[in-house]
Amino acid sequence: MEADRGRNNKVRCAVVDTNVLMYVYLNKADVVGQLREFGFSRFLITASVKRELEKLEMSLRGKEKVAARFALKLLEHFEVVETESEGDPSLIEAAEKYGCILITNDKELKRKAKQRGIPVGYLKEDKRVFVELLD
């Protein structure tokens, strides 16, 4: 089900994955703006994912390098949270700990989050955010 423009108050916080942050620049999608329209007011990124973006900025070239740099600039609007785990598990840990939805285009990560009862969201091909809320 698509998010209902803020009428559902259960989920107000979003943990965002690297692939979504990179997609924002590469595909000119206003993910944060769309999530705000849906009533989300708190955006989290794990320290692990921030480090991953910093490494990508150093190692990538061309558009991807610029996308990583843009994503790091976008993080000025995010809370960086520490987790015990690294990488994808850190996103699941943060979503559980803070009661957030997980926004990712990683199919395996979405599957794992759903198994743990974490609501997920992702970007569709038309650049719109699709949010699957749990009942």
Swiss-Prot record:
Top EC category:
hydrolase
| Family annotation (Pfam families) | PIN_9 (PF18477)
InterPro entries hit by this protein: PIN-like_dom_sf (IPR029060), PIN_9 (IPR041120), PIN_dom (IPR002716), VapC_family (IPR022907)
EC number of this enzyme: 3.1.-.-
Q: Which residues bind Mg(2+)?
A: 17, 88
Per its UniProt record, the required cofactor names are:
Mg(2+)
Source taxon at top rank: Archaea
Q: Give GO MF terms, alphabetically.
A: magnesium ion binding; RNA nuclease activity
| Domain PINc positions | 15-118
This protein's UniProt keywords: Hydrolase, Magnesium, Metal-binding, Nuclease, Toxin-antitoxin system
Query: Family assignment?
Result: Belongs to the PINc/VapC protein family.
Q: How does it assemble?
A: Dimer.
The protein in question is named Ribonuclease VapC9
Name of the gene: vapC9
